[in-house]
Amino acid sequence: MLIKLPTEKTVSAAADALQAAVKANHFGVMQVHNLQETMVKKGVEFAQECLIFEVCQPQQAKKVLDENMSVSTALPCRISIYEEGGKTILATLKPTTLLALFDTPQLKSVAQEVEDTIVKIMKEAASG
């Protein structure tokens, strides 16, 4: 259900590398949420750094949405970068697992392609 990759990079360096890897793999970053910053703005003390990237590949999203608009509730894909146990972690929910919730077996290959690319993006960001 969850894919997690550790990296020796800081959250900031991993975020920069993720931006580049997303672009290199023909996905786009739609939004970046700074969870710590948002919590503080809402009056909640939150010491842990966490960035949540919303990423999308429009052609793949269209294939899925043309088949089942309910899948829009699971879009766009998200990749989080945070610290855990002294390491920086890149994490995402598996698109194949999410799409399985919508009973659309005909879209399994699309979900697998997206998942493979997201894992590739995460590996490039973690190591590159």
Model feature map: region roles:
Residues Q31-V32, G128:
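Flexible, glycine/charged-enriched surface loops at secondary-structure junctions
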